[in-house]
């Protein structure tokens, strides 16, 4: 029988990690895997590729949140080895299972009962002033270029396919993949992009400009971001919140789709739309509909109820009782709107 190798990447600071790791490793070994545990992955320097897992690794099982999955991505970026995420964090958007489902997850891995979801990766070239070749890096989620001086703006010029689109002072910009569109880019006001969309988006951060809106480009295009020579602040680049370095004035940053992809193991056929609604707990019923539903059970003076349609019209049929004012936006269920 051929040897089967698995790598388990863990989040060391989560209280419940130890028990789940022990269970996962035990079950993998029972299934015939030789298991390597990685529990401390320091962020490498920008432009430096850390050692990857061996090509004969069958799967990398990640026990943690999305941040732990991003750490694991550095170990498989240069391989075809898939990642299976078991969520032990908060949202766990990239994870496939929750920690209480670890038994089923390992069983499915052992029987090869999973599909592969290939995710687009962004490639970045950083040209320092006077450089003859770029510093290269990549990102599964996003690449941020922000001001190095917290008290000043960084002055940027934005080009798409060598055509200048805009220039402004700002806190910085985010360039996001579809995978990263539900992360920092989403918090900064960018749209959600479905994973099968081959595109990159650029979101300005607090730009001092009349026109500074998110831009989306196709997979054959390139974002070019120049830190202007007279910028008040130097820049600071960061890939996936981990690999980072300072950038002086006059630096050029070019971001495009990478030829590589990252492979996520999927154990269910849940569409991305369902995953989006579930993970973000989206309020799919608007506040007006919520008010109608509440009204359908409102008692009349005679101890009866009237239908929601009558409530919405402000009357209650023959009873002649006017509907009360519906809830205001933001006051339903104590939840903020999506």
Curated annotation (Swiss-Prot):
It comes from the Bacteria. InterPro entries: ATP-NAD_kinase_N, ATP-NAD_kinase_PpnK-typ_C, NAD/diacylglycerol_kinase_sf, NADK. The lineage of its organism: Bacteria, Bacillati, Actinomycetota, Actinomycetes, Bifidobacteriales. It comes from Bifidobacterium longum subsp. infantis (strain ATCC 15697 / DSM 20088 / JCM 1222 / NCTC 11817 / S12). GO terms for cellular component: cytoplasm. This is NAD kinase. Keywords: ATP-binding, Cytoplasm, Kinase, NAD, NADP, Nucleotide-binding, Transferase. GO terms for molecular function: ATP binding; metal ion binding; NAD binding; NAD+ kinase activity. The gene is nadK. Involved in the regulation of the intracellular balance of NAD and NADP, and is a key enzyme in the biosynthesis of NADP. Catalyzes specifically the phosphorylation on 2'-hydroxyl of the adenosine moiety of NAD to yield NADP. It is found in: Cytoplasm. The keyword Cytoplasm applies. Residues 325-338 have a biased composition (Basic and acidic residues). Its cofactor is a divalent metal cation.
């Amino acid at each position: 029988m051929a040897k089967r190798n698995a790598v388990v990447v863990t989040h060391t600071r989560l209280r419940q990690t130890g028990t789940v790791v022990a269970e996962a490793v035990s079950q993998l070994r029972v299934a015939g895997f030789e298991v390597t545990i990685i529990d401390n992955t320091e962020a490498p320097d920008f432009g430096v590729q850390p050692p990857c897992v061996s090509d004969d690794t069958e799967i990398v099982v990640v026990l943690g949140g999305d941040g732990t999955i991003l750490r694991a991505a550095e170990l498989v970026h240069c391989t075809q080895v898939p990642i299976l995420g078991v969520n032990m964090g908060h949202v766990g958007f990239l994870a496939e299972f929750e920690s209480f489902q670890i038994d089923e997850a390992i069983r499915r891995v052992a029987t090869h009962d999973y599909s592969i979801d290939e995710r687009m990766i962004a490639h970045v070239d950083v040209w320092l002033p006077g450089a003859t070749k770029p510093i290269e890096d990549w990102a599964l989620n996003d690449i941020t270029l922000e001001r190095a001086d917290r008290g000043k703006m960084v002055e940027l010029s934005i080009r798409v396919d060598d055509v200048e689109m805009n220039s402004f002072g700002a806190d910085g910009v985010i360039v996001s993949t579809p995978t990263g569109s539900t992360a920092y880019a989403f918090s900064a006001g960018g749209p959600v992009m479905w994973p099968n969309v081959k595109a990159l988006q650029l979101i300005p951060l607090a730009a001092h400009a009349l026109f500074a809106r998110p831009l989306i480009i196709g997979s054959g295009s390139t974002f070019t971001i120049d830190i202007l020579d007279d910028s008040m602040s130097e820049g600071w680049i960061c890939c996936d919140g981990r690999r980072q370095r300072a950038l002086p004035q006059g630096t050029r940053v070019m971001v495009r789709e990478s030829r590589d992809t990252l492979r996520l193991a999927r154990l269910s056929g849940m569409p991305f739309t369902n995953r989006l609604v579930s993970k973000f707990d989206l309020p799919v019923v608007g506040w007006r509909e919520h008010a109608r539903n509440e009204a359908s059970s409102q008692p009349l003076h005679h101890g009866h109820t009237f239908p929601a349609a009558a409530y919405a019209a402000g009357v209650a049929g023959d009873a002649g009782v006017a509907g009360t004012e519906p809830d205001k936006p933001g006051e339903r269920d104590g939840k903020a709107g999506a």
